[in-house]
C-alpha cells in the first residue's frame, strides 16, 4: 500500500574506465557481466561475481551489498565501491565524492546507501574499484570428512596459498547430492559420502608455477586427511563445469519452491 516500483534498467552506460586510477564509472542499471567484460578488455578485474551475473545490476549489487563468490579475497560490494551518486526522495541529487582509493576526508556517506535497498535514497551511478586481471585460475572440488576438518582446511589453504585464495564455497551433502542428482544436468565431481564438499579457487599471475603449487598444496591436504578426495580442473571448460554446479542453485530451487535466506554466521557457531 503506497509503494511504487522504480526501474533503472535503461541506465546501463559504462561512462568511463580510468586506466591510471583503476576505476570504472557506471550507471546503476549496468549489468554485472557487462561490467566484468569491460574491465577485462582493459586488462582489469572487477572482482564481484555471482551466479546471476547475466541479469544482476550494479545498482542492485550496491543496494543489497552483494557478497558473491570471492568475498574471501576481495570483500563485499561496499569494498569495491569508491563513490556513489544518489537521488533522495525530494529529488535532491547527492553527487559522487571522488574516486580516490585513499580518502580520509570527513564522513564517508556512501556507506549509508550501500545495502540500504533504496530506503534512504536511490543510487544512480557509482565509481567502482578495479584490480589487476589474474593470469591464472586454479580450481578444485574436494570432499571433507568433518566440520572440524573443514575449518582446518580453510585455515590451511588460506596460509598455504599465500594470499591467492579467491573462493572457498562450502556445500553440505544434501545440497551436493541434490544439485548433481538425476534431475539436473550436472555430474558429481567427487563421490557422495562425505558431509561436506568445497569448491576452491585461487587466482595468480604465474600460470605454470601457480598450478604446480596448487597441486602440491592439495597433496599435502590429502596426506594430512583434511580432505578425502579432490578433482582438479585442467582447463577453462572444466573450471566452468565446476562453477556451474555452484551457480545453478537458483534454477534448481525453482523445482522445489521455498523461502530462501542469505544469512551470516560465525564459524564457531556452526557445525
Predicted regions and their residues:
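Noncatalytic alpha-helical scaffold of FAD-dependent oxidoreductases
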Residues: 1-271
Amino acid at each position: 500500500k503506497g509503494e511504487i516500483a522504480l526501474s533503472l534498467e535503461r541506465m546501463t552506460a559504462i561512462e568511463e574506465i580510468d586506466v591510471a586510477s583503476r576505476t570504472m564509472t557506471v550507471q546503476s542499471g549496468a549489468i554485472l557481466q557487462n561490467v566484468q567484460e569491460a574491465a577485462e578488455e582493459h586488462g582489469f578485474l572487477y572482482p564481484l561475481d555471482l551466479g546471476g551475473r547475466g541479469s544482476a545490476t550494479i545498482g542492485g549489487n550496491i543496494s543489497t551489498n552483494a557478497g558473491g563468490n570471492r568475498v574471501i579475497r576481495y570483500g563485499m560490494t561496499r569494498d569495491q565501491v569508491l563513490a556513489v551518486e544518489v537521488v533522495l526522495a525530494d529529488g535532491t541529487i547527492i553527487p559522487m565524492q571522488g574516486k580516490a582509493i585513499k580518502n580520509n576526508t570527513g564522513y564517508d556517506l556512501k556507506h549509508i546507501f550501500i545495502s540500504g535497498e533504496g530506503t534512504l535514497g536511490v543510487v544512480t551511478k557509482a565509481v567502482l574499484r578495479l584490480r589487476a586481471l589474474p593470469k591464472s585460475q586454479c580450481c578444485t572440488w574436494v570432499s571433507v570428512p568433518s566440520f572440524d576438518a573443514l575449518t582446518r582446511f580453510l585455515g590451511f589453504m588460506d596460509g598455504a596459498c599465500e594470499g591467492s585464495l579467491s573462493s572457498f564455497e562450502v556445500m553440505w551433502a544434501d545440497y551436493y547430492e541434490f544439485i548433481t542428482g538425476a534431475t539436473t544436468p550436472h555430474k558429481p565431481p567427487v563421490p557422495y559420502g562425505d558431509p561436506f564438499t568445497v569448491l576452491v579457487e585461487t587466482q595468480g599471475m604465474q600460470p605454470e608455477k601457480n598450478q604446480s603449487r596448487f597441486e602440491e598444496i592439495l597433496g599435502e591436504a590429502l596426506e594430512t586427511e583434511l580432505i578425502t578426495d579432490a578433482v582438479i580442473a585442467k582447463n577453462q571448460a572444466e573450471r566452468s563445469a565446476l562453477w556451474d554446479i555452484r551457480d545453478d542453485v537458483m534454477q534448481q530451487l525453482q523445482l522445489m519452491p521455498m523461502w530462501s535466506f542469505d544469512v551470516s554466521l560465525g564459524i564457531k557457531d556452526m557445525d
